[in-house]
């Protein structure tokens, strides 16, 4: 090819008559390149345009036939390269960098002639970096036909295709990507590959020989820049040109470009024919390129490490600066605190001195009193100002030290110490405090002495306030127990102060804890209050036994209690008096409930009778009857005489200090002996009138109604002697004789009114229960609106079932009733807790007793119709136990059996006993599923007997030994299949086979067991009589000797009972 040296456009002549013009091959641009670590920089990008051939020019130079086969191997070697653009992508970055030196050469050149030299370098450099093999193939084809270079290399055109976009990738990856596909269809690939040997090899391609003049001019134009830009593989001169340094393109350009271009410069402007590269040179170039790539990767890694190290150092420096600033601020705060404390101590000392001075002066001088206050106030005022001045200097110094750092971009802003004078002075919400205002002290001078005194009091924990405040002494009413909150409220003190005092005494308590009256009194006394102790039982004051005026008392009917032994005719006698038939409705013909009735006397008055059970289990009922009665009628059967319950009734009457009337019943029977009864009563100090005593006696017959009128006359006479009176115009008082839980009516209490009048609507209290009277029912079943003294009625309206024997009273309000019942319920709970505490305290003792004696328990759940019957059953069952077994009542109550009772029985394994009550359907079904036994009784005898039998079954049976006889061992025989057999003679009694025996040697029992075999003359026999000889063998024992004595006895198991 020919290269002209005209200053105008350069023309390349690949063949005669053909002219190729290159116009503006390079375009420059600036791109902002970002890196992964967040940094970015500007990069100058040059775009190289392809030279476009006319369609006729591409096919015109036909070339020699020999050149085609020579060029054929080149596409074969270059074809695989475009198929794998991934590895080739980073390599062709070199062409972009050679374009930059070309641009540098273009800037100082006065003529645009050197500009076309730029496309030759990048296009030729790309295949050199991509793969040396295609580059070597093209020069081999060039010597064969130098003129036909362009057409021959038209086939390997795909090789530059990946090189074109990749060449621009290092410089501007975003901009180069769309440029490549845009120019691909316009420019024929041979045009790009034709000038490639001229710039790539620089050492002699065939194309350079065809245009030596142009090549010389091109190289001479680039000569002033190339030596400066080529500096070996590392490209040290690249950064000085103002282009980007450290990129991959600069390293790759420096390797091969630096080796060949000085040779071109030495040739000057003359066109010469360059020789083709040898195999050694190609290998050396390839190795140089590989070394350049390795160095490039290493430099990248080192640059990244340097960047990371610099970033870490920068962050470390920032942290150190922040820590140093924090330490300085902390030290400043510490200094401020120390100075503040010193000033406070000084001011406190001065205040104390001033106080002592004022105390020594006369109190009557007002002027002298104001002077100390002024002197006291003046030292206090400058103290905050002094504090501000002390702290202001270091604060200002630190502020000045921080200003350069804030200007330098240091983000941390430590808290300015100037805020400390604000807290030291106690200033709040006065606006922002700056260094200037803190040093000037204007804010502090505006504060008053009172505000400073308040701050001082806050600092000292209100000690000064407590000393100066006038104490208000109160009278504190203390019950037996009180909560801390309630105690504090009554003293008008803070609860935390009370808790603090208790903590000083070593008690860790909460505000809701309960303390006793002694502790509360100590606390109240320490706080300066006076104490008045009251008891919780004071709520019951005035509830009972209030005195009545004599003029308000009116006569009332007598209350007569009929007592005596069981089956002595008490209920029959009362039926005869009432003209009723109560006996026929009683189960078993015995009275098991206490009943109250009113009978009209033949003399015109009314008499109230209370019928008590005679069974031994109903002792409590008889005691209650004796307490509420005025007269006791002791019924004694003439044919039976005085019995144990008769004696008990006598003792109850004496304990209640009530007169006694003896009614000798059943005088109509043939074996009646009234005289025997009178004589037996003398043994218990009961002397009737017929025997010179003062006790009235009447011989009656309940069934025959003999002398009933005489009995009523005796009762009336006795009541006249007693002169019974009561005040009906007052709130009612009475006694609960019996109580029960009725399914339809709820809790029902049989009440005997003793004083006052009970009306419907009254609020009543009985024991731990209260309620409003909804209805009053007499003994005949009639409903009444009021009941006066000595009138028995059934009261409906209680919120719970009261206990028999509880006293009833009418209160003025429901609040009072609730207060009383809450107190009584609390008392009941405390008693139960005390009992359980005693049980817990003796638990080890009880368990050791159970282990040692084998004591067993029979758990029971008892439900009865009335509370009195339940009480009697519990008392009777508790008496059944002994040291080995006892009845344990899990639960008891009045009312029917429900599901909760069955669930409790299932949990505790107890049996359920119902006395005159039944279980509902749900309870029966639940008991059937759980296998719980429910036993029903209506006679207390049967109930107690069955429980006794069941408890007797828990007793361990005893064994009883019956001696049968003795035998003496005469000789020992060894028998096969049997072992040792003792030949014996029965000395006394008999010896039976299978009975227990003892082997005695030297009067010591050696063995106890059973007799296994008993033979006589080789025949097995059941027994051997005295004087006969026999053979014996024992079960599992062989150590028998002649002269031993065998004792035979029978063991009998005897079942025990309570």
Swiss-Prot record:
Decide whether keyword Endoplasmic reticulum is in the record: no
- Gene3D superfamilies, A to Z: P-loop containing nucleotide triphosphate hydrolases, Translation factors, Translation initiation factor IF- 2, domain 3
In this chain, the stretch annotated as G4 covers 665-668
Write out the residues that bind GTP.
564-571, 611-615, 665-668
**A GO term for molecular function:** guanosine tetraphosphate binding
| Composition bias type Basic and acidic residues, residue spans | 1-12, 292-364
Q: Which Pfam families match?
A: EF-G_D2 (PF22042), GTP_EFTU (PF00009), GTP_EFTU_D2 (PF03144), IF-2 (PF11987), IF2_assoc (PF08364), IF2_N (PF04760)
Write the protein's name: Translation initiation factor IF-2
* Species in which this protein is naturally found: Azorhizobium caulinodans (strain ATCC 43989 / DSM 5975 / JCM 20966 / LMG 6465 / NBRC 14845 / NCIMB 13405 / ORS 571)
Name of the coding gene: infB
């Amino acid at each position: 090819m020919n290269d002209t040296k005209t200053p105008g456009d350069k023309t390349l002549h690949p063949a005669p008559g053909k002219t190729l013009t290159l116009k503006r091959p390079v375009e420059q641009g600036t791109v902002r390149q970002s890196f992964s670590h967040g940094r970015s920089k500007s990069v100058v990008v040059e775009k190289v345009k392809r030279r476009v051939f006319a369609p006729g020019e591409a096919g015109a130079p036909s070339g020699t036939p020999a050149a085609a086969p020579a060029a054929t191997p080149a596409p074969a070697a270059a074809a695989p390269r475009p198929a794998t653009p991934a590895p080739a992508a980073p390599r062709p970055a070199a062409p972009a960098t050679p374009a930059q030196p070309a641009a540098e050469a273009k800037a100082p050149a006065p003529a645009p002639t050197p500009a076309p030299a730029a496309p030759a370098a990048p296009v030729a450099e790309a295949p050199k970096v991509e793969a040396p093999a295609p580059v070597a193939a093209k020069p081999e084809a060039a010597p064969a036909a130098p003129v036909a270079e362009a057409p021959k290399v038209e086939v390997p055109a795909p090789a530059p295709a990946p090189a074109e976009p990749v060449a621009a990738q290092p410089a501007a990856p975003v901009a180069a990507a769309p440029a490549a596909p845009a120019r691909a269809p316009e420019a024929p690939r041979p045009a790009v590959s034709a000038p490639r040997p001229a710039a790539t090899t620089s050492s002699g391609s065939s194309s350079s020989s065809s245009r030596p003049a142009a090549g010389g001019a091109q190289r001479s134009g680039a000569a002033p820049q190339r030596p400066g830009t080529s500096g070996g593989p590392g490209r040290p001169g690249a950064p000085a040109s103002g282009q980007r340094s450290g990129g991959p393109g600069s390293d790759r350009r420096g390797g091969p470009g630096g080796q060949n271009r000085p040779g071109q410069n030495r040739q000057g402007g003359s066109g010469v024919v360059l020789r083709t590269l040898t195999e050694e040179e190609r290998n050396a170039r390839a190795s140089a390129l590989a070394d350049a790539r390795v160095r490039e990767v290493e430099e990248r890694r080192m640059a990244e490490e340097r960047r990371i190290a610099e970033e870490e150092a920068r962050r470390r420096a920032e942290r150190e600066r922040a820590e140093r600033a924090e330490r300085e601020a902390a030290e400043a705060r510490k200094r401020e605190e120390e100075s503040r404390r010193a000033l406070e101590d000084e001011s406190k000392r001065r205040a104390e001195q001033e106080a002592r001075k004022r105390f020594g002066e006369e109190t009557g001088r007002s002027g002298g009193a104001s002077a100390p206050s002024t002197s006291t106030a003046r030292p206090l005022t400058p103290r905050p100002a002094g504090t501000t001045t002390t702290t202001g200097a270091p604060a200002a110094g630190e502020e000045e030290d921080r200003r350069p750092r804030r200007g330098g971009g240091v983000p941390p802003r430590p808290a300015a110490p100037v805020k400390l004078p604000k807290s030291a002075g106690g200033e709040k919400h006065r606006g922002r405090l700056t260094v200037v205002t803190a040093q000037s002290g204007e804010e502090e001078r505006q504060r008053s002495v009172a505000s400073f005194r308040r701050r001082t009091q806050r600092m000292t924990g209100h000690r000064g306030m407590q000393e100066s405040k006038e104490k208000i002494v109160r009278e504190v009413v203390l019950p037996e127990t009180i909560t801390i909150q309630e105690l504090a409220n009554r003293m008008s003190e803070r609860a935390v102060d009370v808790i603090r005092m208790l903590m000083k005494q070593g008690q860790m308590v909460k505000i809701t804890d309960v303390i006793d009256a002694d502790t509360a009194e100590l606390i109240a006394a320490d706080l300066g209050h006076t104490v008045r102790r009251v008891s919780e039982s004071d709520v019951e004051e005035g509830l009972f036994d209030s005195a009545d005026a004599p003029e308000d008392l009116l006569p009332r009917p007598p209350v007569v209690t009929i007592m005596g032994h069981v089956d002595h005719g008490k209920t029959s006698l009362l039926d005869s008096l009432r003209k009723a038939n109560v006996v026929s409705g009683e189960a078993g013909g015995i009275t098991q409930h206490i009943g109250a009735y009113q009978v009209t006397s033949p003399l015109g008055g009314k008499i109230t009778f209370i019928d008590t059970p005679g069974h031994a289990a109903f002792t409590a009922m008889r005691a209650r009857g004796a307490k509420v009665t005025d007269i006791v009628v002791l019924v004694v059967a003439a044919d039976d005489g005085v019995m144990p319950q008769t004696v008990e009734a006598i003792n109850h009457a004496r304990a209640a200090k009530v007169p006694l009337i003896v009614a000798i019943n059943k005088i109509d029977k043939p074996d009646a002996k009234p005289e025997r009864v009178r004589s037996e009563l003398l043994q218990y100090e009961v002397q009737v009138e017929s025997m010179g005593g003062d006790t009235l006696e009447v011989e009656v017959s309940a069934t025959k109604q003999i002398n009933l009128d005489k009995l009523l006359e005796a009762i009336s006479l006795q009541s006249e002697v007693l002169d019974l009176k009561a005040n009906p115009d007052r709130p009612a008082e009475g006694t609960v004789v019996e109580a029960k839980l009725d399914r339809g009516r709820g809790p029902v209490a049989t009440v005997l009114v003793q004083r006052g009048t009970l009306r419907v609507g009254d609020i009543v209290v009985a024991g731990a229960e209260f309620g409003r009277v909804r209805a009053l029912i007499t003994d005949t079943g009639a409903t009444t609106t009021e009941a006066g003294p000595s009138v028995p009625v059934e009261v409906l309206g209680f919120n719970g079932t009261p206990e028999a024997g509880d006293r009833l009273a009418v209160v003025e309000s429901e609040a009072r009733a609730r207060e009383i019942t809450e107190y009584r319920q609390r008392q009941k709970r405390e008693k139960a807790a005390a009992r359980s505490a005693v049980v817990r305290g003796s638990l080890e003792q009880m368990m050791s007793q159970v282990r040692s004696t084998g004591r067993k328990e029979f758990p029971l759940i008892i439900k009865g119709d009335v509370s009195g019957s339940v009480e009697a059953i519990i008392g009777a069952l508790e008496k059944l136990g002994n040291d080995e077994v006892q009845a344990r009542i899990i639960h008891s109550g009045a009312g029917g059996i429900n599901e909760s009772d069955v669930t409790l029985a299932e949990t505790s394994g107890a049996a359920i006993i119902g006395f005159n009550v039944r279980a509902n359907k749900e309870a029966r079904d639940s008991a059937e599923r759980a296998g719980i036994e429910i036993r029903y009784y209506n006679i207390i005898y049967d109930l107690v007997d069955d429980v006794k039998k069941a408890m007797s079954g828990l007793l361990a049976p005893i064994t009883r030994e019956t001696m049968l006889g003795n035998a003496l061992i005469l000789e020992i025989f060894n028998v096969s299949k049997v072992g040792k057999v003792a030949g014996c003679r029965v000395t006394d009694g008999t010896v039976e086979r299978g009975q227990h025996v003892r082997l005695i040697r030297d009067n010591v029992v050696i063995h106890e067991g059973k007799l296994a075999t008993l033979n006589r003359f080789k025949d097995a026999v059941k027994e051997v009589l005295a004087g006969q000889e026999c053979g014996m063998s024992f079960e599992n024992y062989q150590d028998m000797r002649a002269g031993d004595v065998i004792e035979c006895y029978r063991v009998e198991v005897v079942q025990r009972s309570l």
